[in-house]
């Protein structure tokens, strides 16, 4: 397939790395995915929401439940095969979620090879939305105190509030253990030999040479700062092994080295979040922001900023 004149990104050595959001229907548009690769899109955020089909139907996320298009996993892998990394957005707390969801989500994330790109959150009912109205009318909304205690204003249907809160913490821990996280990144970037579209060309052919040298410098900066800054011996040792592992497996391609160094650094961020979740004293009724849904945390911060 031809696409006319050579894209501006290619002519200038791909100076812009792009990302976007899309529905999983993207997997069915071959031409669009090819064009995204040529335009230097690196990643796409996809609202998977849940591996539980009943929850997807409940939320009218019907494009995620289309057997003729393939399973969710098959469609994620199809997008990845077009040199686009998929960031999966996942939510727990739907009416059809029971305790099994806390094992199902980490398994889906692993099978999807979603690396660091798995964003797991608690369902939160935003005021004035149909969900908020329905929950309010059915008496399934937490009050302010309970929202702070459980991290969300949603009262689950098939489990207790404590089970939802503790199950969410458990799912986060499972998803971001060292072995789980790096198992996913290894599966994608080493086992599958994942390459972003510009790497299909000779990296050192003009005008990519300047970009390649810059990526080497950035890789060295990220890797050295990471190994100096991380104080926990177990984390630092694993990060060092991962850096050597990618060097041995993928050689000296500057872009892939930089991306993988960033992936390793991002694990440190998730490790801090899961550590905060594990250390939270759930008996005192005060939840850290890491345990709250994003909208809930923003609401609390906004309230605290208002002068008394």
Where do the language-model regions lie?
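A structural motif corresponding to the C-terminal lobe/cap of the Radical SAM core domain
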Residues: 2-212, 221, 289-308
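Acidic, Ser/Thr-rich low-complexity intrinsically disordered segments
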Residues: 199-241
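C-terminal non-catalytic accessory extensions
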Residues: 229-308
